């Protein structure tokens, strides 16, 4: 009986230990610092390459600058580069003001009303919020053609860094904030990388981190399948990241959502850019320099991707183990507030640490004098959702005309997106064009198109829900302004099936 009691006690103790992870407060601080510093280093390094190499790797002979003083110089002279950071910090500042249970509306309004320029899903979400559409509707693909873009992926870091060792806690944050501007695969990018950050606190195995984090993503999603492929291709080509890049390009590089990426080499889709982050992590194998360079040389969003990779690796290594070469000039940049915020790196090192302590306690962990006890739980998949289900881009109609009074076009399909340009960079003029949109002779919507760059509407109009068949769209400008033009660029047409065969309008070479 005595032996049985001892055995049972040992099993209970083992079970409790298996469900927690203890790390020192010193290590926790060091890892949080490493995560924020890593992001900053990565985005600064990749900045000159951002969207200069689309659909191609960056040439081997292409030099990328890095020198002492470069971090401070870039932060002061090109503050808009750091959208990865200032978007994160917007949400961090809300948590700091209102606590970890800050309402979603506070996060949505804080970023929508901020003074910084935004693009893609972030800007579309901002426009929706400023015009009365709150999350999660603001990020849904039928209200936001950029729903699958990279946006929440590049700003999810805070969710992981305040949830050390707790991937499901990070997912809880992402489920709320990620839907402000994204949906489907765009949302999954932030869930996945947020989970990777959390696991970097409790594991030094990059292979484990990227595989275990994937358990937060539904298996039937395109995002899961792509990242799973990257992990498999890494095993198949363990020493040649370019082979894996080619496999990604061949299988996953067709963007069907983002209007700027459909029928174009440009790709800001979260799935492909997450693949590049994972390529950097897997082939970097814990080497900071290799990781940021490979993630950058994959191209496309070549500043955000090394930022994510370096942030995750910086968390795993901790600040002190980031090589000195990559911290050249970092100290002199750590007290500079990121533009549009009141927060510097030194500030967020401490704020992030305090938020992590509070989040550990909120999820049943413990904080002692010199350590934290983190509750461990297996990552759980978030709910399945899919953007652009049942619609396929089949044609781009070039327009390239100023909308003077009205313009109309006809097409056969079930949906369309009209791209237009009406805002001027840095404009703060309150004027907004007013356009009535008619579909098949009936008013579909009346849109306001600000010329103010910060509050602009990314696309003029879109509709993915028409019955399959012939349609006509008519655009009527109600208030022309001699100081501004509303430039119609093109219309992307969607059908209920992809165009796979030659017809009376297009030739299609089948595989």
Where does each model-flagged region fall?
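Catalytic phosphate/nucleotide-handling subdomain of diverse soluble enzymes
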Residues: 45, 52, 56-64, 185, ...
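Active-site-surrounding "flap" and adjacent substrate/cofactor-binding loops of secreted or lumenal enzymes
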Residues: 48-79, 85-88, 104-119
């Amino acid at each position: 009986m005595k032996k049985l009691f001892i055995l049972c006690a040992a099993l209970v103790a083992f079970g409790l230990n298996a469900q927690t992870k203890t790390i020192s407060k010193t290590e926790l601080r060091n890892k949080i610092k490493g995560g924020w510093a890593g992001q900053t280093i990565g985005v600064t390094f990749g900045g000159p390459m951002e969207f200069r190499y689309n659909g191609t790797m960056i040439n081997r002979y292409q030099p990328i600058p890095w020198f002492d003083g470069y971090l401070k110089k870039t932060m002061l002279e090109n503050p808009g580069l750091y959208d990865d950071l200032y978007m994160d910090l917007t949400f961090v500042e809300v948590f700091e003001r209102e606590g970890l249970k800050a309402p979603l509306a506070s996060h949505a309004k804080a970023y929508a009303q901020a003074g910084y320029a935004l693009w893609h899903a972030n800007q579309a979400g901002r426009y929706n919020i400023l015009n009365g559409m709150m999350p999660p509707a603001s990020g849904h693909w039928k209200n936001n053609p950029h729903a699958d873009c990279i946006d929440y992926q590049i700003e999810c870091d805070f969710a992981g860094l305040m949830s050390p060792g707790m991937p499901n806690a990070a997912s809880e944050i992402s489920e709320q904030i990620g839907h402000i501007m994204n949906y489907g695969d765009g949302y999954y990018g932030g869930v996945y990388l947020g989970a990777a950050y959390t696991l970097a606190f409790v594991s030094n195995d990059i292979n484990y981190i990227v595989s275990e984090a994937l358990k937060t993503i539904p298996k039937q999603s395109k995002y899961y399948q792509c990242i799973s492929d990257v992990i498999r291709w890494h095993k198949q080509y363990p020493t040649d990241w370019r082979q894996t890049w080619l496999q990604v390009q061949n299988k996953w590089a067709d963007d069907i959502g983002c209007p700027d990426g459909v029928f174009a080499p440009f790709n800001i889709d979260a799935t492909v850019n997450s693949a590049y982050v994972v390529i950097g992590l897997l082939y970097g194998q814990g080497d900071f320099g290799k990781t940021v360079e490979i993630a950058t040389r994959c191209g496309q969003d070549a500043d955000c991707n090394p930022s994510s990779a370096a942030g995750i690796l910086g968390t795993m290594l901790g600040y002190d183990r980031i090589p000195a070469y990559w911290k050249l000039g970092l100290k002199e940049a750590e007290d500079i507030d990121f533009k549009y915020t009141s927060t510097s790196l030194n500030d967020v090192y401490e704020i992030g640490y305090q938020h992590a302590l509070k989040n550990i306690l909120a999820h049943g962990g413990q904080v002692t004098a010199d350590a934290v006890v983190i509750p461990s739980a297996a990552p759980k998949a978030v709910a399945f959702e899919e953007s652009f289900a049942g619609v396929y881009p089949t044609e781009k109609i070039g327009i390239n005309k100023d909308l003077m009074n009205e313009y109309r076009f006809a097409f056969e399909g079930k949906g369309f997106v009209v791209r237009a340009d009406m805002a001027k960079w840095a404009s703060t003029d309150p004027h907004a064009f007013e356009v009535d949109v008619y579909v098949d002779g009936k008013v579909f919507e009346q849109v306001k198109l600000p010329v103010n760059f910060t509050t602009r509407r990314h696309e003029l109009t879109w509709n993915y829900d028409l019955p399959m068949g012939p349609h006509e769209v008519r655009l009527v400008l109600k208030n022309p302004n001699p100081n501004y033009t509303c430039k119609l660029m093109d219309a992307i047409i969607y059908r209920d099936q992809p165009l796979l065969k030659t017809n009376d309008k297009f030739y299609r070479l089948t595989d």
